[in-house]
UniProtKB/Swiss-Prot annotation:
A GO term from the CC aspect: plasma membrane
PANTHER family for the chain: 4-HYDROXYBENZOATE POLYPRENYLTRANSFERASE, MITOCHONDRIAL, PRENYLTRANSFERASES
Keyword list, A-Z: Cell inner membrane, Cell membrane, Magnesium, Membrane, Transferase, Transmembrane, Transmembrane helix, Ubiquinone biosynthesis
Top-level taxon of the source organism: Bacteria
Protein name (database record): 4-hydroxybenzoate octaprenyltransferase
Pfam family, one: UbiA
Membrane topology per record: Multi-pass membrane protein
Amino acid sequence: MQSSTAHPSRLALYARLVRIDKPIGTLLLLWPTLWAMWMAADGHPPPALVAIFVVGTVLMRSAGCAINDWADRDFDKHVKRTRERPLTAGLIAPWEALAVAAVLALVAFTLILPLNALTKWLSVAAVLIAGTYPFFKRFFAIPQAYLGIAFGFGIPMAYAAVQDQVPAPAWLMLAANVLWAIAYDTAYAMVDRDDDLLIGIQTSAITFGRFDVAAIMLCYAGFFGIMAWVGHALALGAAYWIGLAAAAALAGYYYTLLRTRDRMQCFFVFRHNNWFGACVFVGAALAYALR
């Protein structure tokens, strides 16, 4: 028993690498995909298609974690929250992280082989965006915007899979997701801001400085403006607007926590955005179900 504790199995280390024990990233990636799928299919997406996208989301988020740890391995050792990650701690080799990411991405791609060509081409773009995101922290002042594209690329893919096209509402939702990602990931970046300043990487929390909370709330406001337009364009019913109102109430609650700039409160806000995304989805799903 002691040996097992001291020397985790390779499988256990790979599970830690891809954050199996931390599903929040998967959920933040999944909600926008589900919003889009329900809207693209008028509330009745094929169950098999939903399953493909749910499993694909889990796989690609896991692959993204492995790539991120490989790219950030020299930075993570200087950050208290990340220095014990398997790759940073030297428990696995860099090539293993790349191999895990490649296998997961390949399995995810096999899931969409039955789908149309547009979806497949968009999946290639999604992989390129996910794979390059970690490097944007080296030079881009607000890498969270690029993260929002990566985490929202399930939106055009869902529309492509259902309609074989990507209409204006899909691109608007992607823009809304970028704003949402800046909001919740800036809260996350506020946790590590002091460490990030020391090691010299870029984050929105550093860029916004003392206007960090104001910027977060402005992003939430922009999100609601765009999603209100989408709801109007798609003639969604009262349930959708109730869902948006519930999400807005959560955003107001987040403000009361973020203004303290307490690290634990900021981390709580980041994690709690799962419920923000859920409110939007439940509202949209009910709006279609009640038609």
